[in-house]
Amino acid sequence: MRSMAKKGLEEVLETLDRIIHDETVPRNVRRVASEIKEKLTTTDEVSLEAASAISVLEDISADPNLPMHVRTMIWNLTSQLERISVE
């Protein structure tokens, strides 16, 4: 993996950690973030898992119970994952 993609992945994992440990985030969203993190860290096909994660994140960003700051974090995650899936 290229260094730019590796750095991008590290940023994604940090953001996922913040979502997972934020008590204001609904439990189902924290669970999904945890699953995405696990898939990204255990696969050899990071670009494929990044594309899959984008789809899931777009679905949960529409959750009406999601705090606005978390929705913004999810949109930023999606943007970062798009860069990883292309590389």
Swiss-Prot record:
It comes from the Archaea. Belongs to the UPF0147 family. InterPro entries: Ta0600-like_sf, UPF0147. Disulfide bonds: none annotated. This is UPF0147 protein AF_2370.1. It holds the Pfam family UPF0147.
